[in-house]
Design a protein with these regions (language model features):
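Hydrophobic helical membrane-anchoring modules
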Residues: 1, 8, 15-16, 170-248, ...
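Hydrophobic targeting segments
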Residues: 2-8, 24-25, 31-35
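Short, well-formed alpha-helical segments that are part of the catalytic scaffolds
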Residues: 11-27
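Acidic helix N-cap motif at the loop->helix transition within catalytic regions
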Residues: 16-19, 41-50, 98
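A conserved acidic beta->alpha catalytic loop
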Residues: 36-44, 93
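Acceptor/aglycone-binding surface of glycosyltransferases and processive sugar-polymer synthases
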Residues: 61, 67-76, 97-167, 171-175, ...
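Short beta-strand-to-loop acidic/aromatic patch adjacent to the donor-nucleotide binding site
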Residues: 80-94
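Short, high-confidence coil segments that cap the C-terminus of an alpha-helix
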Residues: 81-83, 110-112, 190
Length: 295
């Protein structure tokens, strides 16, 4: 697997669990890059020993998983010209080496896609908070963005260098970066392929550094523009319907002009939904709404 680089962000790990995972991983992958994301000083000895055997990029302070992944991807793109695929994995034992290999193999065959290692959330091993969070995020992601993803929280992802270049500049410094990448795949028409992986939670996932309040807010506020988009889209459709209704009511019988009004307003709504860049949604819809009202 010399054409694959495994990228692992590390922040205050359970050293025993991480080492057991690493011992297995090193037997299958020659290229492993770690991000020391400002680990506590009590981990200095372990991380220093790790740096003697592997490449470790060190953050002086904790900058967040998103920043760590982006810095790691940038480093790999610059220093591994012969590699083709990057696989991101967690250090807490949630991802088996076999599953990492499976995702890497699928990525090699699908260089145009983002590969997600997805868990079975119906499994009794999954903590309730993880099930709940995934259901909410999965449904919001599909409702607002149109992206179908069964495991929005997975840290096991594989991608070609070309896909990595498209995702490295995505906004987000902490856990929201991974969610933002899923949104970006829809915007940039990057296919997502899912690989079923083993569901592993050690000690109810107690080593996770995800803050249920702060990090959830960071994740869900990403969808605020899409909520406004839906609102303004509804306003546009309503205005067009009303205008068409007024124009046609004296010409056609009631069922026909109601149907015509609905058809016209729906067509215009679809055109707006498909062609307006998300960065300019709010401004465009506000301006358009004002113009239509004044017509």
């Amino acid at each position: 697997n010399k054409d694959v680089v495994v990228l692992i962000p590390v922040y205050d790990p359970n050293e025993k669990i991480m080492q057991e995972f690493l011992d297995k991983l090193a037997k299958s992958f020659a290229n492993i890059v770690f991000i020391n994301d400002g680990c506590n000083k009590k981990h200095d000895k372990y991380m220093n020993n790790l740096a003697k055997k592997y490449e470790v990029i060190k953050h002086n302070v904790n900058l967040g998983k998103g920043r760590g992944l982006k810095n790691g991807i940038n480093y790999i793109l610059n220093n591994y010209p012969k590699a083709k695929v990057i696989v991101t994995a967690d250090c807490d034992g949630q991802h088996s080496v076999e599953d990492i290999k499976k995702c890497a193999d699928v990525a090699k065959k699908n260089l145009d896609s983002l590969i997600l290692g997805v868990r079975d959330f119906s499994n009794d091993l999954v903590p309730t908070r993880s099930k709940f969070g995934n259901v909410i995020t999965r449904n919001i992601l599909y409702s607002f963005v149109g992206a179908k993803v069964s495991d929005t929280q997975t840290g096991l992802r594989a991608m070609s260098f070309d896909i990595a270049k498209k995702l490295i500049a995505v906004a987000g410094e902490r856990y929201e970066y991974e969610t933002n990448c899923l949104i970006e795949t829809k915007i940039k028409n990057i296919p997502i392929k899912e690989v079923i992986i083993e569901t592993i939670y050690i000690n109810d996932n107690e080593t996770s550094h995800f803050n249920p309040v702060k990090d959830s807010i960071r994740v869900y506020k990403l969808f605020a523009p899409y909520l406004l988009f839906a609102l303004f889209s509804y306003i546009i459709e309503t205005i067009i319907f009303a205008k068409t209704y007024n124009i046609c009511k004296g010409i056609y019988v009631i069922p026909l002009f109601l149907l015509l009004s609905k058809i016209v307003s729906s067509i215009i709504k679809i055109i707006f939904n498909n062609h307006i860049n998300i960065k300019y949604i709010i401004i465009n819809y506000l301006v358009t709404s004002i113009i239509l009202i004044l017509i």
